[in-house]
């Protein structure tokens, strides 16, 4: 199928060119411009040339007298060109120094002032190749859609062709902007131009809108900046102007009108400039002026100082289950010694049978946001030996449970705080411990469930200890004689009749069964039994704690007290 494509009416219509230039100018200034461009982009000249594009019909979807729809392959390599004019900033350093104080830049500085120069760009040798969808109707005009990027290449000629890197920069930027323009703005421009050519009603409406815009521009009243001049106006040389001289000035009066400032404000500005130059803290007050300053929080460059934080108590929940609660402490005071020494933490609440005691520094506490938090381990006992309680600052949370057995209702006395407890080497085995019944007056003050209150029997513990604990010059606190069992006849000669048993400090017993902690329970029960046997053995043999123990003797046998 063949058709006639007449290009000459477009090239001969002057009104068409004028309207096309206006639309292209509006489209080029719609998108954000680079900061180097300081003025609007004006389309100075537009010429479509004498060579029309080559069109190849690929598909025809609809064909009638007043409408047409088809897909074409377009190729263009003609003599069309486009000339643009604008003003650019030839001194990029001025943009950088615009927001900086004048006293921070070296004086004099040749590149301190702004320099804008005119720029003329000519786009020629445009080569296009694309698949287009054309829909034509006399009522709706011509609609053209590019299915791919049509721009293949073009030549950019500008005022800065003698500078290679500026030429390459302009070539790259203009190609990128032109691709966006052709895909987004060019179809809309072609559609409006087609409506103007084939739709008389659209042309009349557009002419009416343009006439109203011109009339509105003429009716605008210019604002006279000299209607309310300052009271003490001065000229460029600092001479005071009277009212008659001010009235003679006009908007077209020359360069002197730009020097009409208040004399007092000029003096204040000079004082402010001197303060900046000399780094003085004096700031003169100027009316109708706003002083901007950065607060330390906005600048982010000042790390505020805070007073030393005191020790705080935290209440973490136990990780072993239940609702057991312990109080731990964290020393967050600084190194200068202003922090206060915390008191020894004690067990406050026991809401379940599983209770943990933590003596380590709390790692959940947060210090100042700009300084690294300091966790310290505080030894609360006055050490009399060279042994240390712990180097890590964290004590193990002891929890002992016995399956299907009642809870031990006996009070656990604490050892004096000035006696450190250290584990010596050695390993001892023994069979069992019978603790007997605990008197009611020695029971701890805590809530007991009805199931625990109905049980009166004491569990028998069979353990294998691993690391016993020793202490010097420490007498074991005693319970009543009736609440504990005595040794058998083979040890009765060397055992005091009123020697009684107490649990080691820091161990707590419960009857709650935990399936995941059976191994831990067995180990702690072994350790408790070994500690009890060693303390009783050494007290009966030597009367004080010894630092050496071979642990070869078999443990004595225990038997329950006759009821």
UniProtKB/Swiss-Prot annotation:
It is found in: Mitochondrion outer membrane. GO terms for molecular function: lipid binding. GO terms for cellular component: ERMES complex. Keywords: Lipid transport, Lipid-binding, Membrane, Mitochondrion, Mitochondrion outer membrane, Transmembrane, Transmembrane beta strand, Transport. One of its GO terms (biological process) is mitochondrial genome maintenance. Belongs to the MDM34 family. Lacks alpha-helical transmembrane segments, suggesting that it resides in the membrane via beta-sheet conformations similar to those predicted for other outer membrane proteins and porin. This is Mitochondrial distribution and morphology protein 34. It comes from Sclerotinia sclerotiorum (strain ATCC 18683 / 1980 / Ss-1). The lineage of its organism: Eukaryota, Fungi, Dikarya, Ascomycota, Pezizomycotina. The gene is mdm34.
């Amino acid at each position: 199928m063949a058709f006639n494509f007449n290009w000459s009416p477009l090239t001969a219509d002057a009104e068409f060119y004028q309207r096309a230039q206006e639309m292209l100018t509006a489209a080029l200034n719609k998108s954000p411009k680079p900061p180097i461009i300081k003025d609007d982009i004006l389309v100075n000249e537009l010429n479509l040339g004498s060579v029309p594009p080559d069109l190849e019909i690929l598909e025809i979807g609809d064909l009638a007298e007043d409408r047409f729809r088809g897909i074409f392959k377009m190729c263009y390599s003609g003599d069309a060109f486009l000339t643009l004019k604008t003003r650019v900033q030839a001194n990029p350093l001025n943009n950088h120094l615009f927001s900086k104080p004048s006293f921070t830049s070296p004086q004099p500085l040749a590149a301190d002032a702004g320099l804008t120069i005119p720029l003329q760009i000519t786009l020629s040798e445009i080569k296009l190749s694309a698949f287009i969808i054309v829909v034509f109707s006399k009522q709706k005009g011509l609609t053209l859609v590019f299915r791919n990027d049509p721009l293949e290449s073009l030549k950019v000629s500008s005022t800065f062709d003698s500078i290679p890197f500026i030429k390459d920069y302009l070539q790259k930027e203009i190609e990128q902007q032109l691709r966006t323009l052709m895909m987004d703005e060019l179809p809309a421009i072609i559609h409006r131009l087609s409506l103007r050519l084939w739709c008389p009603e659209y042309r009349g409406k557009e002419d009416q809108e343009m006439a109203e815009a011109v009339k509105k521009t003429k009716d605008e009243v210019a604002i006279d900046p000299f209607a309310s001049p300052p009271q003490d106006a001065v000229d460029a040389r600092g001479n005071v102007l009277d009212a008659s001289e001010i009235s003679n000035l006009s908007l077209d009066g020359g360069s002197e009108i730009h020097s009409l400032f208040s004399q007092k404000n000029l003096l204040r500005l000079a004082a402010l400039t001197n303060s900046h130059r000399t780094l003085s803290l004096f700031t003169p007050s100027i009316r109708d002026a706003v002083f901007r300053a950065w607060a330390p929080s906005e600048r982010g460059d000042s790390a505020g100082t805070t007073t030393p934080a005191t020790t705080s108590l935290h209440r973490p929940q136990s990780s072993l289950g239940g609702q057991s609660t312990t109080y731990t402490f964290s020393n967050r005071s600084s190194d200068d010694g202003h922090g206060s020494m915390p008191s020894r933490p004690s067990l406050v609440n026991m809401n379940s049978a599983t209770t943990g005691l933590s003596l380590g520094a709390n790692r959940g506490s947060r210090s100042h946001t700009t300084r690294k938090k300091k966790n310290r381990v505080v030894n609360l006992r006055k050490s009399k030996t060279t042994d240390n309680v712990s180097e890590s600052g964290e004590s193990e949370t002891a929890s002992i449970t016995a399956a299907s057995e009642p809870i031990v209702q006996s009070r656990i006395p604490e050892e004096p705080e000035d006696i450190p407890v250290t584990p010596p080497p050695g390993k001892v085995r023994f069979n069992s411990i019978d603790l007997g019944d605990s008197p009611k007056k020695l029971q701890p003050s805590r809530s007991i469930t009805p199931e625990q209150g109905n049980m009166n029997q004491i569990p028998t513990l069979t353990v294998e200890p691993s690391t016993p604990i020793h202490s010097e010059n420490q007498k074991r606190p005693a319970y009543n004689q009736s609440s504990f069992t005595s040794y058998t006849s083979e040890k009765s000669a060397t055992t005091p009749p009123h020697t009684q048993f107490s649990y080691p400090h820091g161990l707590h017993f419960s009857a709650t069964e935990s399936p995941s902690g059976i191994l831990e329970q067995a180990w702690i029960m072994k350790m408790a039994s070994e500690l009890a046997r060693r303390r009783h053995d050494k007290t009966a043999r030597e009367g004080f704690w010894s630092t050496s123990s071979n642990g070869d003797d078999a443990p004595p046998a225990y038997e329950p007290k006759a009821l």
